[in-house]
Amino acid sequence: MGLALHTTRQDGRATIAARGSIDLHSSDELRSRLTELVDAGERAVVVDLTAVDFCDSSGLNVLVRAYKHARAQNATLTVTGAYGRVENVLRTTGLDRFLIEGPAEEAPADGR
């Protein structure tokens, strides 16, 4: 399965809903979209991974570089909706500490 991206704007933020796999073959498309949004002046960008079933190291690299690019432009980039293998790889690599978005009321009681 490839990668499909759908961008919406609401409440001062742009959300990219990704569907499919983020891997070596599809990560450039995500990188381009994220860069375009930040360069166009979006100050809050969210990547919704709810419908993403796989993310390899090239996908992680795109997310890290986009995060750094956003910070350099005084913008934010966060990830939401990660679950299963995708959430596990974000947590294992430590990227969850600065990428995963979630209001306090959604956080588990044990603080994870």
Can you name each region flagged by the protein language model?
Residues M1-D53, R65-R112:
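STAS-like cytosolic regulatory interaction modules
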Residues D56:
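Conserved G/P- and acidic residue-centered "switch" motifs that form tight phosphate/ATP-binding loops
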